[in-house]
Amino acid sequence: MFMLRQGQAHDAQALCTLIFATAPELLPVVLGDKQCLKTYLAHALMLPNGQYSAARHQVLVIHDQQSQDEQVVGCITLWHDDLGADFVNQTISAMINVFTSEQLTQIARINKTLLSVFVPPSRNELALGHISVSPEYQGLGLGKKLIAYGIRQAKLLGKQQVVIDVDSDNEQAVCFYESCDFMTTASTQLALTGQTFLRMVYRL
């Protein structure tokens, strides 16, 4: 039986794998080699707030009634235009605690480029991020459960649109979001990786 709940610190290891799977080309360019990236995520996921905080994610878990064990098999996070100062401060704090000053300067430089491609959500939008399902559980409708959760939250927050950025080469993902009634409204190339990202929108 699958259940959706708020992420917790003990979900960090599973979330690290799921989050990396959402952007395997981009994340190492932004946050360093695989080991550096894992170190950063391991730290950031344990914080109570911030972009990569486990608590900022909803996780899909499969529950074994006999053993009472849980396995995290999917995740999603939500971003809007007013995440608060604590979100920003803890995102920055996580970086300061892991990266050198040279690395931080590089990340800040790259971030300016990223913001021109991954445009932050406007006041009437809710952005979905880190949508991921473990490969062995794909094809069971779990991705649609995550999308449905995001749409419900957008309605509760009074938003007019749900947005997501998708690598245009990820045909499986593009087709999936189209099947969930998302439409492509923009296409932008990211020179850092040579990828083209589609801004896909679901209108409420």
How does the language model describe each region?
Residues 23-45, 85, 96-101:
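Conserved GNAT-fold acetyl-CoA-binding loop/helix
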Residues 96, 159-171, 179-180, 186-204:
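C-terminal "cap" of GNAT-fold acetyltransferases
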Residues 1-10, 73, 203:
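Conserved N-terminal entry element of GNAT/NAT acetyltransferase domains
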Residues 59, 69-80, 127, 132:
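Conserved beta-strand in the GNAT
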Residues 139-152, 175-179:
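Conserved acetyl-CoA-binding loop-helix of GNAT-fold acetyltransferases
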Residues 124-126, 154-165:
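Conserved GNAT acetyl-CoA-binding A-motif
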Residues 82-125:
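Conserved acyl-donor/pantetheine-binding loop and adjacent beta-alpha core of acyl/acetyltransferases
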Residues 34-57, 65:
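Active-site rim helix/loop that mediates acceptor-substrate recognition in acyltransferases
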